[in-house]
């Protein structure tokens, strides 16, 4: 079983690089995208990703200083460096060495810049969202740039681990970069719902965290099939058979009443 998750906009560089760090498969592709991004100015980058001027300047500086060869001084392992709701659920820093080794083979992070990352692949600080309309020699968007490359990489990863199923815990924006016509393994996309007074809905903040928690559950329990996936109960979620399909298992929990109202945003 292979699981995919999205990256995060926020980064936390305050982490030591463990032994066994690896290099991204598409390092050359990433460098080519960096070269394209270096042609942009602050106004271009603000428009491209809806950034403030401060963030646009920061990320232009990141592209300018991007090194052709990542090392432990300038880069950090992807799963440990990304910081966001999904990574709060994943809690990669608390995985044991054995669990991280398993994740290295069975977990992939989709990325606008790097395409596909293993948890311990070294990344340099960047922000380039998959939905960005960055024009390249291959087309008008990053979806054009990546084409079937991401799907092909996932096929190789699945074959290497005898994976017969791909669990999609990524967002629509990122999983949209996977060319399904080129994918050789069936896809299952878990759905996470909150129940308030008998009405269920997806709440973006909670769903992102649950996707990360699902990825952690799969790694820690060496889940290999749908039956094992349905045992997920982290955070109070329960599998609901009558709302589920073979490709979209549904997990529901009571709405956390202490949740901040500002995060009640349906995805």
Swiss-Prot record:
Matching Pfam families: H2O2_YaaD (PF03883)
InterPro entries the UniProt entry points to: YaaA
Coiled-coil annotated spans: none
Cellular component per GO, a single term: cytosol
Superkingdom as given in the UniProt entry: Bacteria
Gene Ontology biological-process annotations: response to hydroperoxide
Family to which the UniProt record says this protein belongs: Belongs to the UPF0246 family.
Protein name: UPF0246 protein Dshi_3333
Record organism: Dinoroseobacter shibae (strain DSM 16493 / NCIMB 14021 / DFL 12)
């Amino acid at each position: 079983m292979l699981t995919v998750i999205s990256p995060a906009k926020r980064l936390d560089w305050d982490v030591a690089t463990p032994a066994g760090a690896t290099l991204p498969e598409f390092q050359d592709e990433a460098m080519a995208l960096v070269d394209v991004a270096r042609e942009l100015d602050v106004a271009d980058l603000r428009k491209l990703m809806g950034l403030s001027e401060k963030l646009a300047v920061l990320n232009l500086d990141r592209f300018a200083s991007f090194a052709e060869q990542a090392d432990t001084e300038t880069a950090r392992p992807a799963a440990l460096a990304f910081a966001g709701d999904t990574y709060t659920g994943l809690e990669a820093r608390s995985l044991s060495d054995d669990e991280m080794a398993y994740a290295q083979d069975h977990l992939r992070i989709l990325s606008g810049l790097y395409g596909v990352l293993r948890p311990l692949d070294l990344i340099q600080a960047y922000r380039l969202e998959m939905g960005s309309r960055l024009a390249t020699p291959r087309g008008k968007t990053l979806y054009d740039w990546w084409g079937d490359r991401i799907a092909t990489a996932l096929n190789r990863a699945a074959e290497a681990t005898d994976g017969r199923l791909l669990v999609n815990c990524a967002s629509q924006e990122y999983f949209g970069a996977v060319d399904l016509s080129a994918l050789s393994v069936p896809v299952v996309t878990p759905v996470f719902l909150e129940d308030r007074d008998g009405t269920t809905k997806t709440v973006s903040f909670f769903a992102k965290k649950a996707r990360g928690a699902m990825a952690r559950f799969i790694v820690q329990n060496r889940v290999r099939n749908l039956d094992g996936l349905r045992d997920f109960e982290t955070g109070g979620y329960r599998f609901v058979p009558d709302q589920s399909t073979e490709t979209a298992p549904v997990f529901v929990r009571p709405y956390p009443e202490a949740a901040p109202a500002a995060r009640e945003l349906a995805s």
